[in-house]
């Protein structure tokens, strides 16, 4: 976390600054696309975004970190401990864990609904016991907590030009779209963890099943039925992106370049998956560095342009107020009104 970002956000307590810095590190290490897009936000909003994503990454590590040997029971107890700390922190108690401290501070600053955090942890707990989903409807209930609430948490930080309730469905859809893309990109790794986030009904519609996916993963052999499933899942994912897209224009202008950049980069992962023949069971699809750089540069240009316009408008308002205050007033009466020639 840069000193400039923390100062701009009004975060001065040394322990709290260290907590936000910890969240920034988690986001930088685990979420390169999100981290890159976050740099396009105004500096005063970046710490809050890092706190939200840092918490999500930390909880996800408890569930999924294969480098840390732990039984499902140990992971479940760790999540329960995290939830207890979270509840205490949101009530105003000083949390021992820095990530919780930063998250609680962000939730208070932006009046974020606490249910979004408890819903998220509920979905994280289900990952310890649930390895698959029968339908998109069933998967959707899981994704409300694992993805949709992330978009809803972000709305107060990003700001909107419409009522927040109007923008909320699109923000939730974007969170879901991003996670559906993750599911497709990481389908092989998730299988290794004993999970498959492609509904059973989708597999059956194309003559496939979980056993076939596991066979292909273990042997490295392609299968046309698996390709058909993945192609259909990508089409579904694109439909969710389309549902989310109108929400970008509902955000505060200074936040749009960040979210548009994340939108383009993440939907670009689908393009990479398609270009690689849907071989996600055998290798990870990535957006080429040159493409990432071009998208980031476009986002930076947009961000600078928006901030320049906003700064000029603010300067014009300040100048108008200064002129009003300096205008001579008649004794005991209002300032004279300037009449324009007709």
Curated annotation (Swiss-Prot):
Domain of life, per lineage: Bacteria
Top class in the EC scheme: transferase
Homology family: Belongs to the phytoene/squalene synthase family.
Function summary: Involved in the biosynthesis of carotenoids. Catalyzes the condensation of two molecules of geranylgeranyl diphosphate (GGPP) to give prephytoene diphosphate (PPPP) and the subsequent rearrangement of the cyclopropylcarbinyl intermediate to yield phytoene.
EC number: 2.5.1.-
CDD domains referenced in this protein's UniProt entry, alphabetically: Trans_IPPS_HH
Name by which UniProt lists this protein: Phytoene synthase
Pathway linked to the protein: Carotenoid biosynthesis; phytoene biosynthesis
Annotated region (Disordered), positions in chain: 321-342
InterPro entries named among the record's database cross-references: Isoprenoid_synthase_dom_sf, Squ/phyt_synthse, Squalene/phytoene_synthase_CS, Trans_IPPS_bact-type, Trans_IPPS_HH
Pfam families for the chain: SQS_PSY
GO terms for MF: 15-cis-phytoene synthase activity; geranylgeranyl diphosphate synthase activity; metal ion binding; squalene synthase [NAD(P)H] activity
GO BP terms in the entry: carotenoid biosynthetic process
Record keywords, A-Z: Carotenoid biosynthesis, Magnesium, Manganese, Metal-binding, Transferase
Cofactor: ATP; Mn(2+); Mg(2+)
Cofactor, how bound (note): ATP is required for the transferase activity but it does not seem to be hydrolyzed during the reaction.
């Amino acid at each position: 976390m840069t000193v400039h970002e923390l100062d701009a956000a009004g975060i001065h307590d040394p322990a709290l600054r260290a907590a936000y810095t910890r969240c920034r590190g988690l986001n930088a290490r685990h979420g390169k696309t999100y981290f890159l897009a976050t740099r396009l936000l105004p500096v005063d909003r970046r710490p809050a975004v890092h706190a939200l994503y840092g918490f999500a990454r930390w909880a996800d590590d408890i569930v999924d970190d294969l480098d840390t040997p732990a039984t499902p029971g140990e992971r479940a107890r760790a999540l329960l401990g995290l939830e207890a700390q979270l509840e205490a922190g949101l009530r105003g108690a000083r949390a021992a864990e820095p990530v919780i401290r930063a998250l609680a501070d962000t939730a208070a600053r932006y009046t974020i609904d606490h249910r979004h955090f408890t819903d998220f942890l509920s979905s994280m707990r289900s990952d310890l016991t649930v390895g698959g989903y029968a339908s998109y409807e069933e998967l959707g209930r899981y994704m409300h907590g694992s993805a949709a609430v992330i978009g809803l948490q972000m709305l107060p930080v990003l700001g909107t030009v419409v009522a927040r309730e109007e923008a909320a469905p699109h923000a939730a859809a974007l969170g879901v779209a991003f996670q559906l893309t993750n599911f497709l990109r990481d389908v092989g790794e998730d299988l290794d963890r004993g999970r498959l986030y492609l509904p059973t009904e989708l597999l059956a519609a194309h003559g496939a099943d979980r056993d076939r996916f596991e066979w292909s993963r273990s042997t490295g052999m392609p299968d046309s039925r698996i390709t058909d499933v993945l192609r259909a899942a990508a089409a579904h994912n694109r439909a969710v992106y389309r549902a989310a897209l109108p929400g970008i224009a509902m955000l505060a202008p200074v936040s749009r370049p960040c979210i548009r950049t994340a939108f383009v980069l993440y939907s670009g992962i689908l393009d990479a998956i398609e270009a690689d023949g849907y071989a996600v069971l055998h290798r990870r699809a990535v957006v080429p560095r040159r493409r990432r750089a071009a998208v980031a540069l476009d986002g930076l240009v947009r961000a600078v342009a928006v901030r320049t316009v906003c700064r000029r408008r603010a300067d014009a308002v300040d100048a108008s107020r200064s002129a009003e205050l300096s205008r001579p007033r008649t004794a005991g009466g209002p300032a004279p009104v300037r009449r324009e020639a007709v």
